[in-house]
Amino acid sequence: MAEPTHLKILHVISGDLWAGAEMQAYTLLSSLRRLAGVEVAAAVMNEGELTRRLRQTGVAVTVLDERHLGARRIVGGLRELMLRWQPDVVHSHRTKENVLASIANRLARNVPSLRTVHGASEHSPKGLKSKLRHAIIGRLDLWCARHVQERVIAVSSELGKKLEAIYPRGKIVVIVNGVDVDGVLAQRGQAPFREREPGATHVGIVGRLVPVKRVDLFLRAMAGLLRDAPTRLWRFHVFGDGPLRAELAALTETLGLVEQVTFHGHRHDIVACMAALDVLVMCSDHEGLPMTALEAVSLGVPVVAHAVGGLVDIVPTDSLVSEHNAEGYSTAILRLLEKGSDAAAQLRQRVLEEYSCARNAERTLCLYQELIGRTSW
């Protein structure tokens, strides 16, 4: 074990994307690193945006590249890292990483371990071989949660309730995501599309172009806005990339939105882009507690969202959509634009008090301390 006044935490995460799980892991690691008596490191399965940002923050990163290493070699690499660095707690994110981290931990030092569940699985395997592999990993993941890892963190109360049907109730702990408000505000800047058309109404969606994000529904809702409020100068923005891009571009043409819709792809200035929107739409089929929503609230950007997951706790009731269809979203957007909202300052203050990265890190640290039986630092 480490010295009594020093806590070492190893996080294990894929890093193949820069999405919600990666964003929250980065925010948590960065915040934990600033706490006295805490040392953090990350084992990441892919080089990418996450590893780049972690290194810039000063977090020690070990890459076990899954493109070149099989599961056995990754487990071996994790075991070697654990024996060398000797963490007090192992914290994993996402299904495959939960399994690999659990096995390596058992083979190494068998220290307390836990996972964060960031939301429901978004992976939809195709083909018999892929489906079989997905099912096997899912069963292993469930076994590890029930018999190897001590705690399961849920990022919203609603997600925590759903997880009670899957995991032992005593293992589930709700720790809501945290956002670095100052860091978000520091990234504000001028978005070119707003500078070009300052008089237009800019509505956008941020996320990977995958089925669960329902960008198709966003586009159909935008067609409804164009139909119901034709005198407005509308501009619609899709930020993100993914396998559905060609299909969504074809749908844009079918809906007659080619002049109004811009597919921006992945943007490094996404915070500045969000800050330039009049409305951000979040119409996923399901969510945990999206970092994008927390960032938008921090920026004072109005959000219209599906009434699911942690969104119901941070989006005003009249901007939540229960009718998960195009008309439901277009109606909510028009209502928001016509009536306006004076809730921005109040919502930002609530985020500062309840969803700050510092509060998230402190609550997570308390859980680590509980797992290893330490209460003073």
Where are these regions (language model features)?
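A conserved mid-protein helix/loop that constitutes part of the nucleotide-sugar donor-binding site
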Residues: 19-30, 201, 205-226, 243-249
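Aromatic "clamp/platform" in nucleotide-sugar-dependent glycosyltransferases that forms part
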Residues: 266, 285
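Membrane-proximal helix-turn-helix segments that form the acceptor-binding/catalytic region
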Residues: 133-152, 166
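Conserved acidic donor-binding segment of nucleotide-sugar-dependent glycosyltransferases
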Residues: 317-327, 335-341
